[in-house]
């Protein structure tokens, strides 16, 4: 089984509805959803602010390629058009980190891969408060491998420029889970 940390964001149209479409599209795979944050756009493109959240999901039959295909399918379903890098989008679904679990062992191992279409963990996640703040909100023990070393997400945030953190503002918006099965623990280390 794999557990994935997904960063979802939108800054076109009904931003909350696009985020909700991603959560709904993942269905019972969803383990946890962070609060929704209003965030300053990342990159040099002038555009509307984003709504961002983090979703943690389990996929008994999923590997990293299957998660990537699922993320791209969610984006296509939202009418995502790939244009300008870091430009506006209806829905952005990024794989941040993926963990492989085995029935024979306790805990999980972070998947590290560098392929032409997928690098895990996400190579810029540690630089993005709009990823780390929501992730920390749903998993206070979260760790991310950076430069070959596991680092606590709270520590990465503490080391970030204050202006980067200040660009991530908690909203009163919420994403709803449609769950037909019981909730599971969030931290992959506790499975």
Curated annotation (Swiss-Prot):
Its EC number is 2.7.6.3. Pathway: Cofactor biosynthesis; tetrahydrofolate biosynthesis; 2-amino-4-hydroxy-6-hydroxymethyl-7,8-dihydropteridine diphosphate from 7,8-dihydroneopterin triphosphate: step 4/4. One of its GO terms (molecular function) is kinase activity. InterPro entries: Hppk (IPR000550), Hppk_sf (IPR035907). One of its GO terms (biological process) is folic acid biosynthetic process. Keywords: ATP-binding, Folate biosynthesis, Kinase, Nucleotide-binding, Transferase. It comes from the Bacteria. It catalyses: 6-hydroxymethyl-7,8-dihydropterin + ATP = (7,8-dihydropterin-6-yl)methyl diphosphate + AMP + H(+). SUPFAM superfamilies: 6-hydroxymethyl-7,8-dihydropterin pyrophosphokinase, HPPK. PROSITE patterns: HPPK (PS00794). PANTHER family: 2-AMINO-4-HYDROXY-6-HYDROXYMETHYLDIHYDROPTERIDINE PYROPHOSPHOKINASE. Belongs to the HPPK family. This is 2-amino-4-hydroxy-6-hydroxymethyldihydropteridine pyrophosphokinase. It comes from Mycobacterium leprae (strain TN).
């Amino acid at each position: 089984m794999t557990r994935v940390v997904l960063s979802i964001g939108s800054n076109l149209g009904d931003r909350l509805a696009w985020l909700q479409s991603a959560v709904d599209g993942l269905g019972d795979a969803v383990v946890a959803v962070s609060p929704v944050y209003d965030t300053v756009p990342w990159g040099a493109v002038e555009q509307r602010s984003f709504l961002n959240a983090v979703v943690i999901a389990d996929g008994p039959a999923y590997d990293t390629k299957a998660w990537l295909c699922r993320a791209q399918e969610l984006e296509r379903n939202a009418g995502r058009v790939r244009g300008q890098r870091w430009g506006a989008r209806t829905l952005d679904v990024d794989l941040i980190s993926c963990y492989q679990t085995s029935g024979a062992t306790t805990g999980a191992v972070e998947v590290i891969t560098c392929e032409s279409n997928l690098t895990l963990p996400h190579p810029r996640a540690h630089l993005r408060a709009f990823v780390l703040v929501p992730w920390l909100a749903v998993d206070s023990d979260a760790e991310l491998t950076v430069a070959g070393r596991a680092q606590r997400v709270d520590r990465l945030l503490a080391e970030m420029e204050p202006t980067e953190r200040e660009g991530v503002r908690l909203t009163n918006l919420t994403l709803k889970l449609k769950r037909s099965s019981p909730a599971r623990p969030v931290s992959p280390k506790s499975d």
